[in-house]
Amino acid sequence: MASPAQPAATMAAFARMVKGQVRSYSAPVDMAIPASKRKFIPSSGSYPKGFVVSGTHVGVKASNTKFPDLALISSETPCSAAAVFTTNKFQAAPVQVSRDIIKTRQGQGIRSVVINSGCANAVTGKGGLEDAVSMGKKVDECDGLNEPSTLVMSTGVIGQRLPISKILKKVPVAHANLSSTHDAWLTTARAICTTDTFPKLLSRTFTLPSSPGRTYSLAGMTKGAGMIHPNMATLLGVLCTDAPIEPSALQSLLKHSVNRSFNSISVDGDTSTNDTIAILANGAAGGAPISSSSSDDYAAMQDILTSFAQSLSQLVVRDGEGATKFVTVRVQNSPDYESGRLIASTIARSPLVKTALYGKDANWGRILCAIGYTQGVAPGTVVPEHTSVSFKPVDGSPVLNLLVNGEPEQVDEERASVILQEEDLEIVVDLGGGEKGEQGLGGEEAVYWFCDFSHEYVTINGDYRT
């Protein structure tokens, strides 16, 4: 594959702004990255061996006249691949095509992922499926491959056909510009953005127990700011590693990590037609392949991948449409993980909780209400007289108790106001009445991340197609 140097993705290119416009409204446009978000954009990275990427301008949406909206992520050698997809019944064409490719290839021999922003290619019938197939096939042709080896993703407005001729014309350009530089990775992450205010890219190095002297790398990019809720939302993500992992192990590793990361975030409670998180592992760094779930390497990789996916998914919440708060809800002393996750999810989805946090109102009754109406939890999970709720400040100061063992506390409203002025907040729900396991509930903990609802969220989504 060609790997020419890619033009530097400068901050200036991201910092220009259309007058009066805050977000990109389903296709990249001139926009300013909020000062508070610039700290999340990496200035360098540690990227996996054998992977090259590019971001290319197509103009999928007519209003985008110059910014990259076609992303290509490729490995110079065949990869193991795994993916998780949306549970929405109206699954977009690229979701159907990518799912079939992974199934047919049994997670082996995948080389690339191609992604367009600006059009979701969802609810587009037979023609949409043909378009998705043709996108992947064009990449395969550039690689000289005869078998389907490219996963396809799309994001943007639902119900519109892709300008497929424009896209196919630019795929060879994207392929020719493939590069391994940090600027290339950042430009590629920008190419998948829609209403995002900043590109979301992370990378890290790690070691495995079987090869403590060998360094591996893991990189990931994601997009999403609205229509975000688990079981996947307008949320796309691609993870790449040069560690050697067999397909069956890779699928179970990804599922575990996604359940505790991308499936544990919420912006607005809506689940998209296009959600996909995929991971490619090319083994370019060498070492023994991870194949058994009972191995030390598997356990280590599970922790590494889960932690990485959590950090990546949290960037989506921090960029939630109109968000002013990043909220962690921690449910403790649940009889099982899933019951705790359901309670955390219900709190995170509650419009009343989200608007109270935006208004800096310590209205803990709304949190308690959400706990009480949570569906699907194990019997006996929620016992009012054993339940406690508190705010945990990010500055390390003592928690502010709101409810203890079912009894309301005399809340210091002034201190509550100070805590709620901060961008970050943690809500702790203890189902066991205090100390872990005190009520014999098993001590399981589930964590969820969400943001508040503001006036801007309504404005952004009211104007989405304009």
Curated annotation (Swiss-Prot):
Enzyme class: transferase
Cell compartments where the protein resides: Mitochondrion matrix
Any one of the GO CC terms: mitochondrial matrix
A single MF term (Gene Ontology): L-glutamate N-acetyltransferase activity
Site positions per UniProt: Involved in the stabilization of negative charge on the oxyanion by the formation of the oxyanion hole: T155, G156
UniProt keyword annotations, A-Z: Acyltransferase, Amino-acid biosynthesis, Arginine biosynthesis, Autocatalytic cleavage, Mitochondrion, Multifunctional enzyme, Transferase
PTM comment, free text: The alpha and beta chains are autoproteolytically processed from a single precursor protein within the mitochondrion.
Other notes: This protein may be expected to contain an N-terminal transit peptide but none has been predicted.
Name by which UniProt lists this protein: Arginine biosynthesis bifunctional protein ArgJ, mitochondrial
Organism: Aspergillus flavus (strain ATCC 200026 / FGSC A1120 / IAM 13836 / NRRL 3357 / JCM 12722 / SRRC 167)
